[in-house]
Design a protein with these regions (language model features):
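Outer-membrane beta-barrel channels and translocator barrels
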Residues: 15-21, 60-65, 112-116, 164-168
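Transmembrane beta-strands of outer-membrane beta-barrel proteins
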Residues: 22-28, 53, 66-74, 103-105, ...
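Short glycine/proline- and aromatic-enriched beta-strand/turn motifs that initiate or cap beta-hairpins
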Residues: 1-39, 206, 212-214
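Extracellular loop and loop/strand-boundary signature of outer-membrane beta-barrel proteins
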Residues: 1-2, 35-46, 87-96, 133-151, ...
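Residues that define the transmembrane beta-barrel architecture of outer-membrane proteins
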Residues: 2-10, 32, 45-53, 66, ...
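Transmembrane beta-strands of outer-membrane beta-barrel pores
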Residues: 28-36, 74-82, 111, 123-131, ...
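Predominantly the C-terminal beta-signal and adjacent terminal strand-loop region
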Residues: 121, 147-215
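Outer-membrane pore/translocation modules
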Residues: 33-106, 196
């Protein structure tokens, strides 16, 4: 199965300068849109959104004409997909919630282009620490209970390039997640165990263009 769509998002970041070039940074990202589903039939315009929050600590290191800033921290990602309704083949959909706690490890490279502009590149690896998947199968109206699974294997990658001039910034980004198969949980129908269910391995690729204002 696959889901594809377009989102609009908002990023907020704040940085506090500490001693000896160290810094503390907080990030908050919200993205909202809709996706088209292909799998057990097709369905279009399913609401889909996520929110991501992180706390990072790092240190700036001047090297020649550039600044390298390695960092690490703790992040949380929540994704919601509303697939309720009937697909083109008559399959019933349901809501899904993904919860990830992860360890971000990355490095920022900053290079001055002139007195007013600089190029900033960021490369990050995200190690999944804990994940929980909630499948609200009761939405399908077939007597099934909701399913809760844990996902503890996976990783993410983030790459971005920003051209900054004065207080403005613009540039492309790519985000990727690869999450392993979950554990199995007992599946109930009308309160009676009828089998087991799990969340299959999945991956997410997100790319786009970011524009920002610093103040």
């Amino acid at each position: 199965m696959s889901s594809k769509g377009v989102k609009m998002g908002l990023d907020l970041s704040t940085t506090s300068v500490l001693l000896d070039g160290q810094f503390l940074r907080g990030d908050l990202r919200y993205a909202l849109g809709s996706v088209d589903y292909t799998g057990s039939g097709t369905a279009s315009a399913q609401p889909d959104w996520y929110v991501e929050a992180r706390v990072l600590i790092g240190k700036d290191r001047a090297i020649n004409d550039a600044v390298l800033s390695p960092y690490f921290g703790l992040g949380y990602r929540y994704l919601f997909n509303d697939a309720r309704g009937i697909t083109s083949t008559g399959a019933a959909g349901y809501r899904r919630e993904s919860n990830y706690i992860y360890l971000p490890i990355g490095i920022i490279h900053r290079m001055a282009l002139n007195d007013q502009a600089q190029l900033e590149s960021t490369l990050e690896y995200d190690h999944l620490l804990a994940g929980k998947q909630v499948s609200q199968l009761s939405d399908a109206g077939l007597g099934y209970g909701d399913l809760n699974n844990t996902q503890n294997k996976g990783y993410g990658l983030k790459l971005s390039i920003l051209y900054k001039k004065d207080e403005w910034a613009v540039g492309p980004f790519v985000h990727y997640w690869n999450i392993g198969k979950s554990d199995t949980a007992i599946l109930f129908r009308y309160g009676t165990p009828v089998g087991t269910g799990w969340e299959p391995a999945n991956n997410t690729l997100e790319f786009g263009l970011k524009a920002g204002l610093q103040f």
